[in-house]
Structure formats: C-alpha cells, structure tokens
Amino acid sequence: MANVVVVGAQWGDEGKGKIVDWLSEQADIVARFQGGHNAGHTLVINGETYKLALLPSGVLRPSKLAVIGNGVVFDPQAFLDEVERLTKQGVAISPENLRVAENVTLILPLHRELDALRENASKATSIGTTQRGIGPAYEDKVGRRAIRLMDLADIDTLPHKIERLLTHHNALRRGLGLSEFEAGAILKELTALAPRLLPYAETVWRLLDIKRREGKRILFEGAQGALLDVDHGTYPYVTSSNTVAAQAATGTGMGPGSVGYVLGICKAYTTRVGQGPFPTELDNEIGRKIGERGREFGTNTGRPRRCGWFDAVLVRQTVRTCGIHGLALTKLDILDGFDSIEVCVGYMLDGKEIDHLPAGEGAQARVVPIYETIEGWKEPTANARSWADLPAQAVKYVRRVEELVGCPIALLSTSPEREDTILVQNPFEA
C-alpha cells in the first residue's frame, strides 16, 4: 500500500510521534487530519528533544512536505509560537515545506476563554479538557459560523463573518454575566495575523490528489487516540473530533480508498489523562512505578497520566473500529523487571462476562476487568533493535498480545530514540 494512516489505539499518548517520525523517512508527505494543539508529541532525535503540538511530525525531516488538513482546528498564535520555537532549535519551517488547508477552522481567544469557563465551572461537569478552545471551535464549525483561514484573504467580508460568530458567543456571555466581545478587536487581530498565515494556505485536497497521482507516499498522522473519538470513545469523556482512521480521508479531502494501510499505536500497558472510565487503572504502587518509569506526564499540560495494565479488550475494539492492519507496540521496556504482568482479557458487567466496552457511561463505570497473568522478564528490552535482542519471555508477551487483540505487531519500540525500533512488517510495503 502506498499510503499509511497512524492512529492511537488507546486514549492517546501511545508514542505516535516517534513512530510517525520513524515512518516519515519513507514518506514524501506527512499530513495531520484532526484535533488541534491539545495533543502533544515528544520526539528525541540525536539526543535533542522536540515537542510538537499542532505541526505534523514531518517538519523535523528535511525535504518532507508537512500538511495540516481541514479536519484540524487551527490556533494561529499557537501555530506561530510553535514555528518560532522549532526554528530556534534549528528546524527549517516555511511555506515551502509546510502547507495548511485553506478551509481549516480557526481557534480564536473567545474559544479558549469559553473552554476554560466551562471546564472550571464545576468539578461535576469537568471532563478534563486542555482548555485550549478545541471543543468550542469544533462547535462553531458544525454550527456553520466558524472563521476559516481562507476568510483572512477577503478582509471586506470578514466583518460580517465575525458579527455572525459573535451573535452566538455574545449571547452566551450575556447569559454568564460576562462582558461582550467587540467585533472590531477581533477584526484587528485577524487582519494583523493574515500576512503571516496566508502564505501557508493551500487547497489541500487538490495538493494531495496531485501528489497521490504522482506516486508520492502519504503518511496520515492522527492525534490523541481512538478511545477519545467523539462517536466511538468513552463519551462524554472524549475529544470533539473523530479520531478513528476513517477521519484521515474526511480530514484531508482524500477518498477513503486512498488512505491505505492503517497502523495502530499502543503501549505495552495503558494510560489515560483526565477524567473518564479506565477499567485496568492501578491506583497503587505498581501504577505509580509504571508512571515513574514511563515518565507519564502530558507533553502539553504536564498532567500526570493514570496508569494501568494492558487492556486487550479495548485495543481489540479499536482494531475493529479503525480497521487496523498492524500495531506498533511501544514502551515494552517499561515492563522490564516485573515478576508477573496482568493483561485484561474480558470484563464482568452486572454478573455477566462481556467482550467489549459498553457505550453507556454508567455501564462503563461498572465493568470489572478479567485478568490473565503472564510471567515477566528480568533481562532488559530497552534499546533492543531486533527480536534476537529481546528476552524470550518478552517475546511471549508480545505474541500473546497479538493473539488477544486479533492483530499482528508490525513494529516494536524499545526507547524514545527513533533507531530503537524493531520492524516486523513495513506498513508502506504491506
């Protein structure tokens, strides 16, 4: 298959950044297709740490074209700040190697403020958003009142579009007892940003179609994880976009038949940030040990991640909803030294055994994991680059994961460094 889609197979933070960076060496184009600057990637290249939030990981590789698709919500200031920060680290970024869909929805200060107001209003209604305006921006997109990048090229019609947007937002603010936003201030800000943003604007669907017809390889980079999908995730503790693999087509303008091989990324254990159900969560010393070893803190927020054993039920479910062809298993080295390792193979719900996570919030909270115990290993897996480097028991663990989720392991990651990767099946050649 000429193209590859990379998606998180859990709740995000699975190590997609490293895998995308590793695969991007074989790709011509790396395209983001959903989310915003709420989901960060940390990449370690030759000892240098790079933190990305909005930009595709492909920007770190010279000669690759990076693309931000229409399915993304785009914060102009966050974009400019990230470009500036990476430029200071020696990364060359310009309209020559980075294009942004002209019809991408913009995140404005009013979106960030509304997000924070909702999240901080009550602990009872908090779902753990990053308060970066992602959800409110998607709401405006669906409500057909969003400001898009292309609108900055037509300053004459922009005031009308801002007024349409404020008809909604100022009504909300009046209800909250807050002062209203002024259209003139927003117009001034967007007018000032336009010359810095418009050089990146592109008709992305057309660009990608041309490149596809030329035989170029496209790598579609997802953010977050499939269990945060607004339809297929643990609703309402989800993000505001579709994070499953099918969104790669919708979020870039490519046809579904053009997406190609679907590679799911999952950790050898499970983590989650924020609120929501987590059947295998370990609120004990083992969970803290995994978190410390794995340095489980959010790239963007710094929030500690909740940690637990590998949940084969959830990953198997994601394999189905995303149509995953192969998995990349990351952070196997974090499990080094455990005498035994637990893997969730099913759930008990109200006295009955089930093989999937139910859609209802109440039922999700009541499921109890059924565990299978697997013998651990003492020898290190860290920095392994071939199957021969792995302890026999670690190989057995990987093989058992394959059996339980019904999907082969295509890649195995044993450290944050891009070279510490074991290739089983090349997604671009599958």
UniProtKB/Swiss-Prot annotation:
Gene Ontology MF annotations: adenylosuccinate synthase activity; GTP binding; magnesium ion binding
An example Gene Ontology CC term for this record: cytoplasm
Keyword GTP-binding: yes
Cofactor(s) annotated in UniProt: Mg(2+)
Enzyme Commission identifier(s): 6.3.4.4
Entry binding sites for IMP: 13-16, 38-41, 130, 144, 224, 239, 303
Positions contributing to substrate binding: 299-305
Cofactor note: Binds 1 Mg(2+) ion per subunit.
Domain of life: Bacteria
Metabolic or biological pathway: Purine metabolism; AMP biosynthesis via de novo pathway; AMP from IMP: step 1/2
InterPro entries from the UniProt entry: Adenylosuccin_syn_GTP-bd (IPR018220), Adenylosuccin_syn_Lys_AS (IPR033128), Adenylosuccinate_synth_dom1 (IPR042109), Adenylosuccinate_synth_dom2 (IPR042110), Adenylosuccinate_synth_dom3 (IPR042111), Adenylosuccinate_synthetase (IPR001114), P-loop_NTPase (IPR027417)
Residue sites binding Mg(2+) per the record: 13, 40
Family: Belongs to the adenylosuccinate synthetase family.
Assembly mode: Homodimer.
PANTHER family: ADENYLOSUCCINATE SYNTHETASE
The protein's name in its UniProt record: Adenylosuccinate synthetase
Organism: Rhodopseudomonas palustris (strain BisB5)
